[in-house]
Amino acid sequence: MRRAVDANDVARMFRDFTGGSANLYGSGHPEGKSYWKGTDGRDVTAYFIENQLDLLAKLKQQPRSQRDVLILPMMPQLRTTCHIAGEYALQPEDAYRHFADSVCVINDFDRRDYLYEVPLRTLCCRDFPNLITAGRSAAADGYAWDVLRVIPPAILTGQAAGLVCAHAMREGCGVAEVDIGKLQAALEAADVMVHFDDRLIPDGHQGGERADVGHL
């Protein structure tokens, strides 16, 4: 309370605690601790219970008279679980690289000037002509999966995926076989940036640069 009053900022009244010690990129993961995949109910339940117990143990170490517990997290924060084996998997070194079949441009949420074009091939597989995906379930490796999984890229790839389906139905073909020129024109007509302007590349950077901040 004193910090909130001194700073004239009510947000200073609140503190948050996490169950585990690992950060967004996997640093701080306890040695010898297995990873939760989040692909079945038992795994998700084990993750949830253990993290809640760790969180309560941390709270018990705090002075009880100095704060009230307002809420405990009720949603497992599993950010990457599984994705398709697409025709192409977006790579960390694809920053500033152009793709002929790009359907949108996204950026690294940690460093907004790291630009990626997302090729249609990351959203589908020719072996499954009626299957397409978006966001974190699209094909990507390493840190590129982190870049692709967050909400703005999920929105853009989701919009592209929906439009691909409409074009596939109209053209009578699989999702990987749509006329890419017509698709890109339709996306651009909807104000979607399909290819980034090279003038947006910061000085000292170039296509094929690896953007990685420590993903395991």
Regions found by a protein language model. Name each.
Residues 1-216:
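Flavin (FAD/FMN)-binding glycine-rich loop and adjacent Rossmann-like elements that form
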